[in-house]
């Protein structure tokens, strides 16, 4: 584990940025979307220490980059530290992330834990590694957040991840749930935030290409074919090509839930409807008014 690298001048994130108009248009869009997510869900507050989980993939690089740029212009003061979990995967290029962090004056930690061997051992033959791997990764990162005094743990999930999770739970889990933009961990010790919640994956792909991030592929799970999530993602990509507004509408639905129009008895008290109906009929004047309205409508026809 490496101690965080600090510039002698304090916060000094000044990367060499692309100069194209396409980059600045996209940057403006991403800043706006991330800013709205942070505001809508009160993700970052004055004095926060935000631990950004960096895997070396396009999503976490983009998240870290946008948050660091926000820190330069934000009206509040908050700290950012990048954390990578080195899971000891064979062939993992251990020098890539430290070099990127140091070249850009980004405080970082490398947390070394051999979760790769444990995942391989605990996963039954023929099953994917995702469940075991993610559980071990979460436990390691959440515990480390407590060690360094992080008040928020930032994850790189984007809008399309949230939608894909919704359909995974719908098709395979029998539940209506996705990934919330902000969440209290199950042990109630960490606040998890997803600042990219409003950002589309295709914009992240484009941004990562323009910024030329040193992407590290995931050889552990990326080599496994026919993952349920991969199939869902392919479905979403096809929808996006054929019906460009469909994913936007689906994500909007996740923010516009009507419990009374579903069938979850824990979410909505259906029994109270009977008492409400009886209360209405106890008022003879109210009942007379309703009948008058009905009679008028029939007369009009």
Swiss-Prot record:
Its EC number is 2.8.1.-. Its cofactor is Mg(2+); [4Fe-4S] cluster. This is tRNA-cytidine(32) 2-sulfurtransferase. It catalyses: cytidine(32) in tRNA + S-sulfanyl-L-cysteinyl-[cysteine desulfurase] + AH2 + ATP = 2-thiocytidine(32) in tRNA + L-cysteinyl-[cysteine desulfurase] + A + AMP + diphosphate + H(+). It is found in: Cytoplasm. [4Fe-4S] cluster binds at residues 130, 133, 221. The lineage of its organism: Bacteria, Pseudomonadati, Pseudomonadota, Gammaproteobacteria, Moraxellales. The thiolation reaction likely consists of two steps: a first activation step by ATP to form an adenylated intermediate of the target base of tRNA, and a second nucleophilic substitution step of the sulfur (S) atom supplied by the hydrosulfide attached to the Fe-S cluster. Homodimer. It comes from Acinetobacter baumannii (strain AYE). Keywords: 4Fe-4S, ATP-binding, Cytoplasm, Iron, Iron-sulfur, Magnesium, Metal-binding, Nucleotide-binding, RNA-binding, Transferase, tRNA processing, tRNA-binding. It is an enzyme of class 2 (transferase). One of its GO terms (cellular component) is cytoplasm. Pfam families: ATP_bind_3. CDD domains: TtcA-like. HAMAP family: TtcA (MF_01850). Binds 1 [4Fe-4S] cluster per subunit. The cluster is chelated by three Cys residues, the fourth Fe has a free coordination site that may bind a sulfur atom transferred from the persulfide of IscS. One of its GO terms (molecular function) is 4 iron, 4 sulfur cluster binding. Belongs to the TtcA family.
